[in-house]
C-alpha cells in the first residue's frame, strides 16, 4: 500500500497477537516501525524480527520517545494495546479504572500528543484497535464492552471532526482473534468468539484493505456489519437474542 511506504509507524501492544501482526505487515509494506509493549523482551523480539525499533513501556507515555526514534515524525499511530477486562457491574472499581485507562484514555492521550502536528501538515493516520464488543457488547465482560464502546466513539469523533483536515482514522472491530486475550476470555469466549476466530494476520489484512479503500470501519468478520444493522433496526430483539446466549453461558458454567 503506497500510503505507508517509508511511513513512520507506531504500534502499541505489539509484543504479540494483533499488534505483532500489524507491526509485521507495516514493516513488510516498507514502513519504519516502532514496536511498543509493556513487556520489553517481547517488544525487542518483534522489533528485531522486522527490523524495527523497540520502545517498551506504558503505551500512554511513549509518544515522544517513539517520535524521536522515528526522526521526529509519526505518520501512523496504531492504538492497539488493550485490556480484556471481564466481570459485571460488581467488578472492583480498580478493574473499571484500568480498563478505562488502557482502552480509552491511552487513545485520547496519544491523539492529544499527535494531532497538532498532523493538522499543521495536513496528514496523519490514527488506527484504533477496538473490538466487535465496541459495536455489539460481549457477555460476561461489562468493563471491556463499555470501554470498547468508548474507544469506538472516540475514533468516530476523531474522524468526523478532522477528516476534512487530512486526518485518516480507522476503527478495527474484530470478533474472536486467536490471541492470548481470547484464551483469557474463558468460557464466554469459547461460546461466542472461538467458533469464528481468525488469525491475527487476517486482522492486518483487513486493515490494509481498509487503508487502500480509505474506509473508517474495519471488519475482519464481515458478518458484524449485519449484526450491527440488526441491533440498530430492532434493539429489543437483538438484546433478547443476546440474553439467550447469556442464559446458555450460565447453564454451561
Predicted regions and their residues:
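Conserved glycine-rich cofactor-binding loop
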Residues: 8, 15-16
Amino acid at each position: 500500500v503506497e500510503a505507508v511506504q517509508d511511513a513512520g509507524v507506531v504500534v502499541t501492544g505489539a509484543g504479540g497477537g494483533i499488534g505483532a501482526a500489524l507491526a509485521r505487515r507495516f514493516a513488510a509494506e516498507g514502513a519504519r516501525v516502532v514496536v511498543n509493549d509493556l513487556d520489553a523482551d517481547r517488544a525487542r523480539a518483534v522489533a528485531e524480527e522486522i527490523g524495527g525499533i523497540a520502545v517498551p513501556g506504558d503505551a500512554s507515555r511513549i509518544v515522544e520517545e517513539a517520535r524521536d526514534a522515528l526522526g521526529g515524525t509519526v505518520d501512523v499511530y496504531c492504538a492497539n494495546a488493550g485490556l480484556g477486562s471481564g466481570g459485571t457491574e460488581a467488578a472492583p472499581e480498580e478493574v473499571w479504572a484500568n480498563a478505562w485507562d488502557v482502552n480509552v484514555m491511552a487513545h485520547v492521550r496519544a491523539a492529544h500528543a499527535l494531532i497538532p502536528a498532523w493538522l499543521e501538515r495536513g496528514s496523519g493516520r490514527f488506527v484504533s484497535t477496538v473490538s466487535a464488543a465496541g459495536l455489539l457488547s460481549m457477555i460476561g465482560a461489562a468493563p471491556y464492552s463499555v470501554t470498547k464502546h468508548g474507544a469506538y466513539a472516540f475514533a468516530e469523533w476523531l474522524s468526523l471532526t478532522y477528516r476534512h483536515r487530512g486526518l485518516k482514522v480507522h476503527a478495527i472491530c474484530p470478533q474472536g482473534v486467536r490471541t492470548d486475550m481470547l484464551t483469557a476470555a474463558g468460557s464466554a469466549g469459547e461460546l461466542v468468539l472461538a467458533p469464528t476466530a481468525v488469525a491475527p494476520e487476517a486482522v492486518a489484512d483487513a486493515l490494509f484493505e481498509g487503508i487502500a479503500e480509505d474506509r473508517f470501519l474495519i471488519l475482519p468478520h464481515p458478518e458484524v456489519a449485519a449484526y450491527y444493522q440488526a441491533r440498530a433496526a430492532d434493539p429489543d430483539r437483538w438484546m433478547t437474542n443476546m440474553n439467550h446466549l447469556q442464559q446458555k453461558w450460565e447453564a454451561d458454567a
